[in-house]
Amino acid sequence: MPRLKRSEAERRGAETAGPDFLEALARGLRVVQAFDREHRQLSLSDVARRVELPRASVRRTLHTLVHLGFAATDGRMFRLTPRVLNLAGAYLMSNAISDILQPAVERLTAEVGEACSAAVLDGDDVIMIAHASPNRVISVNAQIGLRLPAVSSSLGRVLLAALDDRQLDRLLGRIKPAKLTSATVTDRAELRRAIRKARDDGYALVDQEVEAGFRSIAVPLRRLDGSVIASLNIGAHSNRGGADAMRSLLLPKLRALAAELQNQMI
């Protein structure tokens, strides 16, 4: 396990910061930086070795990050969550992600004439990070920053499909699915089947479970290494063609865009 080397600037900063320097904050930021493309999940011992800090200090830091929602754990391995993006503020959200995804969903909306969105998983919800609609109103609720239940939305189900069975069972055992419409699936066994189907099929289609009269289809967006980073969907009023039409006409467009964007994801 390679160690995370401190830059010369970091060393000088710590040495010359003076009495107001917060060592605990510095340790916390260093623990966050232990995770990268090659180290997406780490054990407590792995983190301690990489940052060269005592296990007790790293344990407290990781516990705090999990408690605040910036990290997640299965009891042994730790990983960062999308909430870490908040640490970088608007710059990271608007420039690193939306600068790629927002023009892409706008282009797809112009091509298919339906609403298109992108989202990331945050806990039990998805957060919409890019959205475009045609001139007509599709959904009064759709907007960047909107949170939706992951288990009920097409954007969320393709993200949950990337979880292993143990992680999925833990999530389904924890949540209390809300009955958003008369069509919303709340039975945990049915939700498990729907998410596993999304895993097998490579897409999820949700019919009026989040909003009455609104149907959507989604695919995962992957990094170059194959890991899922976000999801893309197309949504339309249920009177604008059926589910089969979505699969035959819109799904190929979504998959083509996801394949194109994969080359830009790091």
Placement of each model-derived feature along the sequence:
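Juxtadomain coupling helices with adjacent low-complexity linkers
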Residues: 2, 228-266
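N-terminal helix-turn-helix
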Residues: 2-99, 259-264
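Short, solvent-exposed recognition segments
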Residues: 2-11, 137-210
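Amphipathic alpha-helical effector-binding/dimerization core
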Residues: 77-175
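Short loop/turn motifs at secondary-structure junctions and domain boundaries
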Residues: 110-111, 208-213
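Short hydrophobic beta-strand micro-motif common in sensory/regulatory domains
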Residues: 215-219
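Sensor-regulatory modules in signal-transduction proteins
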Residues: 221-224
